[in-house]
């Protein structure tokens, strides 16, 4: 077991995990100090906000003959590569063990780590003997705090090869020591091949086991998702060629978040390509973790030759927080589901569809038959861009992961599709189909369309009226799902084809109501009269007289009460009325004609005599026949006058000596007197209360006298102040304390007020208060 240096041990916490070697030759050397980091040019930040699926291209680095400096290059995808290089000697057969410099690594915020092994290019394929001793990889921490992780290769990890030329170099089992300084789970992937170039065509691969034991940290946060992307450019048999063929790695990554799951096994299969160097292709593995995924499918991007050999190794990992399975094997056939873009000319890229279900939360890559229209979905709070495809297929699709075929069932039309968990607006569809719930999300770029394989594109419109369409929904393009307003409940929807609908109205709001929503008791005939007369309902409610019922006179005759009183018809029951402002000319002509016939036609019916109230009489007389002129509809009795000689009434009892009239009039007078007395009593009481509480107006008189506060004039106030000052001077001369002086002044002020009130009472002794 390796001995950790004191410098490194002082930096590590107590709960650091312990690793044990499974080698036959346990190394005795201790860890060397971490090497110095390379210049800042080797650090290239990873670009995570890309509009397509991230693809990783391998990188080959050309090494100098004797130089020990590692030069790292990156591809156009701006990925961060950690490239440990080994120094190879071409002049001597026995090379001294050297410790190459490892460029430092900075992990981006999305916790991606890419380790790329670079093949060394020697001058002579048969003149180099390689010794690898004391290599150490300094990897930045995958946690947020950025604590380092040490991947150390001890000095005696293999025996130096002594063969020359085409001799075989057999590597010994490798011991890798991983040290982490954080309480987060870290995945370490190691390969069985040597980390440096070998000049021999035959390489013996060995299996090595890495045991990692770690105490689970006490944390309340959710599981941390780490993305690990490994790209390798393996050695080639011909070292004189400038490039090498990278292997195709296909795999399936399943993340288990349960802390009590059994240990899982990591199997890594490598492929050394034997095709010529001019047919170099790129190996890309895209791993895009969800926010909290439980299944993740890794799909190979490039194809490979069927005759290439395969090497595998097993690394059991025991992680306390959760076990992860990484199975990377070689597949002889091309995977039908491919993602990303490739630089190879023989590869065919197929668009994929991503369907995310929040309950089980798995991500499946499904190939499509035809390239459809692609819609970009902006998910708030996510670092990745998702692409939504609007055309679906009915057949089942296969995803090849590690040589096994997984057949996914066909997408059902009634399957709920979740596009954004934050928006939960359920829109029920009521056609003669299977009901489904669609979660719409307003987009500014394209419309959201619910499509199935059997039905064409449909537009969902409500069958019932909506109270109001929201202004932010009016800017959506055609084909957008309209949700009902809050409080309307479950309403029916009519599904119409999209070609029949041109666009959604663009005003700020559109109110869709029915006639049942109007809450008014006004009949339609009265509404027509209101529109003709131009009067409001509030004015009609305050109307004091009876409405007219004219039907043929157009309200232009004297028997129309409105016309006879010189008023316009207001809220009347008349038909074809001309007694309004709209027919002012016809009305003026009718008035002139009536005045020509009777100059006093428009005078009041009850006129005054010359000598007083007793001479009041009706101008035309009444025409009562059955009431005896003792009802209110008799104009003479209503006006409290007796019928005169001009009246044409029959059985009249409204005369001076009539006992019936006297009885009725006495009762009416008694009632009127009683009402007047009650009104006077209420008025007197209210006036007295207001006088006692407020006394705001001095205009109230009491029989010519004055109220007490009217005597407080300017002179009286000055005299009162003089009395108060005199009392203060006397208290000062007698050396009275301050409290006693204040008391004397207040007593003097009370005596002054008492004098004012008594003087006012003497002035109005003969005039009692009758206010």
From Swiss-Prot:
Localisation: Nucleus
Annotated spans, Linker: 606-619
Domain of life, source organism: Eukaryota
Name this polypeptide is given: Protein lin-54 homolog
Site positions for Critical for interaction with target DNA: 559, 633
Binding site for Zn(2+) 6: 629, 643, 649, 652
Tagged with keyword Repressor: yes
Region (Disordered): 21-44, 68-105
Sites where the protein binds Zn(2+) 1: 548, 550, 555, 560
């Amino acid at each position: 077991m390796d001995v950790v240096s004191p410098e490194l041990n002082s930096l590590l916490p107590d709960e650091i995990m312990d690793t044990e070697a499974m080698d036959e030759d346990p190394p005795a050397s201790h860890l060397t100090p971490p090497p110095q980091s390379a210049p800042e040019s080797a650090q290239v930040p990873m670009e995570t906000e890309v509009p397509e699926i991230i693809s990783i291209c391998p990188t080959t680095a050309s090494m100098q003959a004797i130089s020990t400096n590692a030069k790292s290059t990156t591809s156009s995808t701006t990925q961060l590569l950690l490239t440990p290089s080994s120094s190879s000697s071409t002049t001597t057969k026995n090379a001294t063990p050297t410790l190459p410099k490892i460029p430092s690594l900075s992990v981006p915020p999305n916790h991606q780590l890419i380790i790329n092994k670079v093949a060394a290019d020697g001058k002579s394929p048969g003149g180099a003997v390689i010794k690898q001793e004391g290599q150490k990889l300094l990897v930045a921490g995958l946690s947020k705090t950025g604590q380092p992780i040490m991947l150390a290769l001890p000095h005696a990890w293999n025996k130096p090869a002594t063969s020359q030329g085409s001799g075989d170099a057999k590597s010994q089992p490798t011991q890798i020591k991983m040290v982490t300084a954080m309480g987060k789970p870290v995945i370490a992937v190691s390969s069985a091949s040597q980390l440096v170039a070998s000049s021999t065509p035959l390489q013996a691969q060995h299996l090595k086991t890495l045991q990692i034991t770690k105490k689970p940290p006490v944390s309340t946060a959710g599981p941390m998702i780490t993305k690990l992307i490994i790209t390798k450019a393996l050695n080639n048999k011909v070292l004189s060629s400038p490039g090498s063929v990278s292997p195709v790695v296909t795999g399936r990554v399943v993340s288990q978040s349960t802390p009590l799951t059994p240990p899982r096994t990591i199997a890594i299969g490598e492929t050394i390509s034997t095709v010529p160097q001019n047919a170099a292709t790129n190996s890309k593995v895209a791993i895009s973790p969800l926010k909290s995924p439980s299944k993740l499918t890794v799909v190979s991007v490039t194809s490979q030759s069927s005759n290439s050999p395969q090497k595998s190794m097993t690394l059991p990992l025991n992680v306390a927080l959760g076990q992860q399975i990484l199975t990377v094997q070689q597949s002889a056939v091309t995977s039908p589901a491919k993602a990303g873009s490739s630089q190879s000319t023989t590869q065919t890229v197929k668009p994929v569809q991503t369907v995310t279900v929040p309950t089980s939360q798995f991500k499946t890559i499904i190939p499509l038959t035809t390239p459809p229209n692609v819609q970009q979905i902006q998910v708030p709070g996510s670092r990745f861009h998702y692409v939504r495809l609007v055309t679906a297929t009915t057949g089942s699709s296969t995803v090849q992961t590690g040589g096994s075929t997984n057949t996914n069932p066909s997408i059902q039309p009634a399957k709920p599709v979740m596009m954004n968990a934050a928006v939960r607006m359920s829109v029920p569809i009521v056609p003669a189909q299977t009901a489904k719930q669609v979660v719409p999300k307003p987009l500014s770029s394209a419309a959201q369309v619910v499509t199935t394989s059997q039905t064409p594109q449909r537009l969902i419109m409500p069958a019932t009226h909506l109270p109001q369409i929201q202004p932010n929904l009016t800017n959506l393009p055609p084909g957008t799902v309209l949700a009902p307003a809050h409080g309307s409940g479950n309403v029916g929807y009519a599904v119409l084809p999209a070609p029949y609908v041109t666009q959604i109205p663009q005003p700020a709001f559109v109110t869709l109501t029915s006639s049942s929503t109007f809450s008014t008791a006004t009949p339609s005939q009265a509404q027509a009269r209101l529109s003709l007369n131009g009067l409001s309902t509030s004015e009609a409610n305050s109307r004091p007289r009876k409405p007219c019922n004219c039907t043929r006179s157009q309200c232009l005759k004297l028997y129309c009460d409105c016309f006879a009183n010189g008023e316009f018809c207001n809220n009347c029951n008349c038909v074809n009325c001309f007694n309004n402002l709209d027919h002012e000319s016809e009305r003026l002509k009718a008035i002139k004609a009536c005045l020509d016939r009777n100059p006093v036609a428009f005078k009041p019916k009850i006129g005054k005599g010359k000598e007083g109230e007793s001479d009041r009489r009706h101008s035309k007389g009444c025409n009562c026949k059955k009431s005896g002129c003792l009802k209110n509809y008799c104009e003479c009795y209503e006006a409290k006058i007796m019928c005169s000689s001009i009246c044409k009434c029959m059985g009249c009892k409204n005369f001076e000596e009539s006992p019936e009239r006297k009885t009725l009039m006495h009762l009416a007078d008694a009632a009127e007197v009683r009402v007047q007395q009650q009104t006077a009593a209420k008025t007197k009481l209210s006036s007295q209360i207001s006088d006692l509480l407020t006394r705001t107006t001095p205009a109230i008189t009491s029989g010519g006298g004055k109220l007490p506060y009217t005597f407080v004039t300017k002179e009286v106030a000055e005299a009162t102040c003089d009395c108060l000052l005199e009392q203060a001077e006397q208290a000062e001369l007698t050396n009275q304390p301050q409290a006693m002086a204040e008391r004397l002044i207040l007593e003097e002020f009370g005596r002054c007020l008492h004098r004012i009130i008594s003087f006012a009472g003497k002035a109005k002794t003969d005039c009692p208060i009758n206010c």
